[in-house]
Amino acid sequence: MSESLKNCDKIRSFPITERYRNIDIIYEDNHLLVVCKPANMLSQRDRTGDHDLQSLLKQWLKDRYRKPGEVFLGLVQRLDRPTRGVMVLARTSKAASRLSEQIRKRIFKKEYLAVVLGKNIKNRELIHHLEKDASRNMAVVTSGQAEPVGSSGKPGPGGPRGSRLAVLDVTHLETQGEHSLVKIDLKTGRFHQIRAQLAAEGTPIAGDNKYGSKVSQTRHLALMCHKIAFEHPTRRESMQFTAGLPEEFPWDKFRRPR
């Protein structure tokens, strides 16, 4: 099955209270919950104590079905706090285990979209070595382009000790003025990988001041998980969910008239 959503900003599919107004619930069954996480919301609880998607959805399930006690909701896929987009959560431990296995085997597919600063964007594979700078909460590119060394992600030639191989594909979709819309397919999953690698190529994501984007009227980081595709954990049918572009700048430069 395939479901499409216009953006990640408004609830449409299910009755919902004011408390959960910023979360789009795209699909629900006894095994899965597919949602569109808004920008600047945590995927799961951390030490800040700020609202997080997983906890809010657990409470939503309790309220919706009047469930006493603890509700299981497994987070098998995560998005960084500033990144919006489609996520699937598991309502049973069996579904969580099977979805996690699909991620390990690369059966689970994720497609990201980003608006970057730059005009002459080439379709290419980006290969870097990244190291996490915990003091600044950033990923640092420690070497230039390098050859991959298999799927393990261990440093190859030119990769300093402590670094990890980061690989992604960039596809140019459209350019409007100083902004370009690109599609990103991750080959590895590293901390801040997309943000760090695009910035290293001189095309930082719009609104990403941490990685060198100039200050603009962009409200949020212009990065989203646009599409996910996987096999249903019990029915074994193909599932695909897509979120459309947000209505805010700079995404609105690439939205088509209705």
Which residue ranges define each predicted feature?
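RNA pseudouridine synthases
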Residues: 1-258
